[in-house]
Amino acid sequence: MQNLTGPTPFPTDFSAQEANGLPSFSDGDIIRRPQLLEYANSWPAEVDEASLLPWLDSYFKRLSPIVPVLSHIAVYEAMLLGRHRSDRDLGAMILSMCSIVMIQAVYTEEAAHLDERTKTAKLWMQHSARMRSTWDFGQDPTIETILTSFFLFGCLFSNGQQRAAWHQLRLAVDMSCQIGLDQPDVYLLKTKQEREQRIRIYLSLAVTERYGFHIQN
């Protein structure tokens, strides 16, 4: 019998025959994998930042007054500095922000274009999910990671995909607990602006989670 070294939640006893039957990777495969990972997490080449700006404007005009969890100045500044291209959490959040405003914040006179908007939003959601699909996703969540799941929840819920939506909401809630949004002592170490943002996020998640529990039961 062969035993795996290190902690694992899975059975660790394998016979030699089972071990020999496992797939192997050549040196070339191992060398290429980091490059593939870097590509997978990069900003999508087919998404032009200029096409996102009107939707970011719409987000801050239509949704931000309802869920005031982001500073429009901070988001625009980050985009102008190109941070969304090097910070996959920020890039994924921006794409999810634009997606939710395309699907949810629809005025009556815009309803005729909803199908086209939904198609584009789904593409951006796919890019958003791809940007943060790393092997260690969830190990070190950020505010951007939490909000991405929160926005994806809204997109999926509006699209009638409730099970996937609740999964994203649970992710957002779990990650918010990981960084201590439910622990008052953590707020003492933050600036006034950070405290206010985190409190708004925590309240938004708590209210949404309670609403979700109510309609599911």
Model features per residue range: what roles?
Residues M1-L4, T120, N217:
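Short intrinsically disordered, low-complexity coil segments enriched in acidic
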Residues N20-Q35, V173-S176:
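Short, compositionally biased low-complexity segments
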Residues M1-N20:
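Intrinsically disordered, low-complexity transactivation/modulatory regions
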Residues H72-L90, T145-I146, F153, L169, ...:
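Intrinsically disordered, low-complexity acidic/Ser/Thr-rich segments used as protein-protein interaction/activation
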Residues R32-I146, F150-Q161:
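C-terminal transcriptional activation/regulatory domains of eukaryotic transcription factors
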Residues E18-F25, N41, I73:
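Low-complexity, intrinsically disordered regulatory regions of large metazoan proteins
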